[in-house]
Design a protein with these regions (language model features):
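Feature responds to low-complexity, polar/acidic, surface-exposed segments characteristic
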Residues: 2-37, 43-98, 105-167, 180-228
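Glycine- and acidic/polar-rich repeat regions and solenoidal domains
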Residues: 322, 565-569, 587-593, 607-907
């Protein structure tokens, strides 16, 4: 909004406010600025940002922070965030992904290994200057060597630090960036500043202002705010002939909210004011139950710090609000609020591993592994075992300074291609049996510490059933005999397996092992760990926050972490929203929202859970009453750390609910499970749209990134305008099965799959983009398939009616019987009533038409004897699919077909006009709608576009105008 003030008093107040944020830069051409002044100027130009504690110029700079600066200096931040370029590194957190990806794709930065970026590691001067020189288009090993980058930088006029100056700081980087703006590229043409002005990163006027070269800038007004250091008396003072009274100050603005404050350092005598905040969340809640405003919305501001809970923080119906008077609990702008069930422990109790235990580790691990008595850490009871019919590892989750740690495993990979492949002995796929496997890996056979505690976790029977067991090892034969019964037994052949909880496999940063015999905890710390680092463990056995029966209650800007149960649980709520939150480290779910209407999760990051990270359900399928709930604009990753079977990263249920604009990645199994086995809630008329699914289904087969199965109540699901890429793995242990982007299983029917992009980036022979197993009445149209070897796989049962209605059929019959007498269902899907009445000719062919299928570096692999090699059916039943002749298929010719896309190399898969002309009914897919859109986070308000006019003299009027922005939209701004 635009606010214009025409009083001298108001202008002075405005300038005072601005000057508190932007130190004055000296006018003229001297440019003798302090590092702090440079940082403020660079912030004004959008090139440097602080933390919630200010610029912290004395602090060190990490590798991810360094590449973020470089990307901004190229004027490429918006492009990086929009495209989120791929990179091979597994240790990069979501926020840094676009910057690291851009830097990697443009040869600005490399990793510390093929798969590790070195996230959190401190950057050295040589490394930072190497990035800077690459930005200026100088080449490694041609123009300079990375370890002597300072020599070339100094020749170019860039500041370098003296030898033995200690660690490279953020302030050092600011000094370099400031000088870099006036440095020319290698070609000798324009300076970096000129290039950024041309790109629109900032204007020439803004640049001149920060240099003090524009007389209209704020610096030119500053003398009226500062006393003359050597004032001279007026030799002939004259009275003002027309004295004017001082203008009345503006009245206090009307309050727009009821603010209440709480702080972890607040005292028991706090009154909830900003200066005397309450000391606990319960104190605020109880105060508001008696004193909440009946005229204004209520906002509870949580001041920065860590709130350690010893029981669930409960909010109920009486704590909610109304549409006119909502209640919001939120972090104070610009401050970090952590709500946790773990007080944590300092690493000061740890010491380097020594003696016999040290000798058991790899040479590299011997240098880094640390150990402590678990009892001295006061983290709670630690145990490692199996639970849930041995489908789930029962172990805590650890984090170190907020970075997730992993139970030690061998090999260190999420992909079954890299796992050990063990031969099953005396296989039988019988429930309750004790599998046997034969180990041949010499490394593992050489290990001997606490062998009985090891967990053998693998796909021993089916490609979709990851489960585990303890066992006894015969060192002479290498045969391991399970001591835990298996739900599915084992199948013949070589099967992929991980070994968990073997001490000797503790060999990479972020791993941990607990010795259950000695009670000692071993960790391999991250590179930036110090003795003051905080180790947290999921020890509290309660949900952290519960909202039950409330309406119009919002939680914003919080970091919620560490519990054996769930993070935030909402039940029977209406118009309750979790926004701008980070939720990590839960043995249960990070978020569970049930029986809800108009409620959901948005603009948040969710990661590192033992099982599904999010559960959402709202609406009644029997009455078709909608929930209108949502999960939108979230990053969801690294879920299902200990269980994948029938889970998925997100369990999405309800009626007319929406899953939109999310990025879901780095999940070994299903990303989104919208229906599986009728009995509980289902999905009806739900929409899954504008999402990016990538690097999922990393280790299983016969499952989908988006999966629904065995539920006749699930109808009308729309899957549209999503992008699926880097799906699946190339493991050949189950050659008859693949992974899928979208999988409708065991008779699930009545969906629409439209406007999606499948590929590129599939993995070998084992990806089928869309699969339907026994279902019917689904439409797949206007989709783009890029290098998907099999675009569509459909299994068409010989007797559809029997499979749907017989309990020994597809497994869907019990759920069908729940709705085939429901007129709301049978009026929309008459085939249900027909099956109820004994009719058999009810199969409605699936439709696959108006799709574009392009191969750039692969050939289709579907039914080899079919006229449609990009389709796969059982018994060549392509004739039972409608529309196969109405698709555009472009096979690889002499070229690679990448020229058929607007900008394939940079991930723009819009089709050129000549392709669109070949399939007139195809609508161009709008990629700009896909994925996470930037969300404001917990930001402070800001003023920009300041202009001042008039005569800056006492008694005269000057006019100030500025644009006030408050990204969060909160009243505190």
């Amino acid at each position: 909004m635009k606010r214009i003030y025409k009083s001298c008093v108001a202008v002075l107040l405005l300038l005072a406010m601005l000057l508190s944020c932007v130190p004055a830069l000296a006018a003229g051409s001297s440019h003798s600025y302090t590092t702090l002044q440079k940082a403020e100027a660079l912030k004004t130009l959008g090139l440097f940002q602080g933390t919630n504690k200010g610029f912290e110029l004395e602090k060190t700079l990490t590798r991810e922070q360094a590449i973020t600066l470089i990307v901004r200096l190229l004027g490429a931040e918006a492009e990086a965030k929009e495209k989120n370029p791929a990179h091979p590194f597994t240790d990069v957190l979501a926020w840094a992904g676009p910057y690291v990806g851009y830097g990697y794709q443009n040869a600005l930065v490399k990793g510390v290994s093929e798969t590790l970026f070195g996230y959190g590691k401190l950057v050295t001067e040589a490394q930072f200057l190497t990035m800077v020189l690459r930005l200026l288009q100088y080449e490694d090993d041609t123009d300079f060597t990375w370890n002597k980058s300072a020599e070339l930088a100094e020749k170019l006029g860039l500041p370098v630090v003296p030898a033995n100056s200690g660690e490279y700081t953020r302030g050092n980087a600011v000094d370099v960036i400031w000088a870099l703006l006036e440095t020319k590229f290698k070609s000798g043409g324009k300076t970096l500043a000129q290039t950024l002005i041309e790109k629109g990163v900032f204007t020439e006027k803004a640049y001149r202002e920060v240099l003090g070269e524009d007389s209209s800038n704020i610096g030119a007004i500053l003398p009226i705010l500062r006393p003359d250091p050597d004032p001279k008396p007026d030799p002939d003072p004259k009275p003002d002939p027309d004295p004017k009274p001082d203008p009345d100050p503006d009245p206090d603005p009307e309050p727009t909210e009821q603010p209440v404050y709480v702080s972890p350092s607040g005292g028991s005598d706090g009154d909830g004011s900003k200066d005397a905040p309450f000391g606990s969340l319960e104190a605020v809640r109880d105060y508001l139950r008696e004193n909440r405003s009946t005229e204004l919305p209520t906002t509870v501001y949580l001041r920065g710090g860590t709130y350690v809970l010893n029981k669930t923080f409960e909010l109920t119906a009486e704590d909610g609000g109304t549409e006119e008077l909502p209640v919001t609990w939120r972090a104070y702008p610009g401050e970090t609020v952590i709500i946790t069930g773990s007080a944590g422990a300092s690493l000061s109790a740890f010491e380097p591993v020594s003696g016999e235990m040290k000798e058991k580790l790899s040479p590299d691990a011997q240098k880094h592994v640390m150990v402590a008595d678990a009892s001295a850490l006061d983290l709670g009871t630690i145990s490692v075992g199996l639970t849930q019919s041995n489908f789930c590892i029962d172990a805590p989750l650890f984090s170190l300074d907020g970075q997730h740690m992993r139970l030690t495993r061998y090999p260190n990979s999420n992909s079954t291609e890299d796992w050990m492949h063990v031969e099953t002995v005396d296989p039988t796929q019988t429930s309750g049996t004790y599998p046997k496997i034969k180990l041949t890996d010499e490394t593992v056979l050489g290990w001997d510490h606490n062998a009985a505690d090891r967990i053998y976790f693998g796909y021993f029977s089916y490609g979709w059933a990851l489960h585990g067991f303890h066992g006894t090892l015969d060192p002479e034969t290498g045969i391991v005999t399970a001591t835990d019964a298996s739900h599915y037994g084992s199948a013949a052949g070589l099967k992929p397996m991980l070994l968990y909880n073997a001490y000797e496999s503790l060999d990479e940063p972020g791993e941990w092992y607990y010795d259950q015999m000695s009670g000692r905890l071993y960790i391999y710390p991250f590179a930036d760990t110090t003795r003051n680092s905080t180790l947290r463990m999921t020890s509290s056995n309660f949900d952290l926050i519960s909202v039950n029966g409330a309406s119009y209650l919002n939680l914003e800007g919080l970091t919620v972490t560490s519990s054996k149960k769930d993070g935030i649980v909402m039940n029977n709520v209406d118009h309750c929203v979790i926004e701008n939150c980070t939720l990590t480290s839960f043995e249960g779910r990070a978020v569970s929202i049930d029986n809800a209407t108009y409620s959901g999760l948005k603009n948040s990051e969710v990661a590192y859970t033992s099982i599904s990270a999010i559960y959402l359900n709202g609406g009644d399928y029997q009455t078709m009453e909608p929930g209108y709930d949502f999960i939108t604009n979230c990053r969801i990753h690294d879920t299902n750390q200990y269980r994948t079977m029938n889970e998925g990263g997100v369990k999405f249920r309800g009626v007319k609910n929406t899953f939109s604009n999310n990025e879901v990645y780095n999940i070994t199994d299903m990303a989104l499970n919208f229906a599986i086995v009728g009995g509980g809630p289902t999905s009806l008329d739900c929409v899954i749209e504008n999402n990016s699914f990538h690097d999922v289904v990393l280790n299983g087969k016969d499952m989908g990134a988006v999966y629904g199965g065995r539920d006749a109540r699930c109808q009308g699901v729309v899957i549209r305008n999503n992008h699926f890429y880097n799906i699946a793995n190339n493991d050949s242990s189950f050659p008859s099965f693949s992974a899928n982007a979208v999988y409708l299983d065991d008779g699930l029917s009545g969906a629409a799959v439209t406007g999606n992009i499948f590929g590129p980036g599939a993995s070998g022979e084992y990806l089928e983009a869309v699969k339907i197993n026994c279902g019917h009445d689904t439409v797949i149209t206007n989709d783009l398939f890029i290098d998907t070897l099999c675009a569509f796989n459909v299994y068409i049962a010989g007797n559809f009616a029997v499979g749907m209605t017989n309990d020994s059929g597809f497994g869907i019959a019990p759920s069908l019987r729940q709705v085939w007498n429901n007129e709301l269902y049978t009026s929309r899907w008459p085939w249900m009533a027909a099956l109820r009445d004994g009719e058999t000719d009810v199969y409605i062919p699936n439709i696959f038409k108006n799709n574009v299928i392009i191969y750039t570096d692969a050939a289709p692999r579907g039914s080899e004897t079919s006229a449609y090699p990009w389709v796969k059916t059982n018994d060549n039943q392509e004739s039972k699919i409608t529309g196969l002749d109405n698709n555009l298929v472009i096979l690889k010719g002499e070229g690679d077909n990448r020229q058929l896309f607007v900008d394939y190399a940079n991930g723009n898969y819009a089709l050129i006009d000549s392709v669109l002309a070949q399939l007139p009914g195809f609508e161009q897919i709008d990629q700009s709608r896909i994925g996470v859109k930037s969300f404001p986070g917990n930001q402070k308000p800001a003023a920009s576009g300041v202009s001042i006019s008039g005569t800056a003299e006492v008694g005269q009027t000057i006019t100030a105008a500025y644009t006030f922005s408050d990204a969060d939209g909160d009243s505190e701004g």
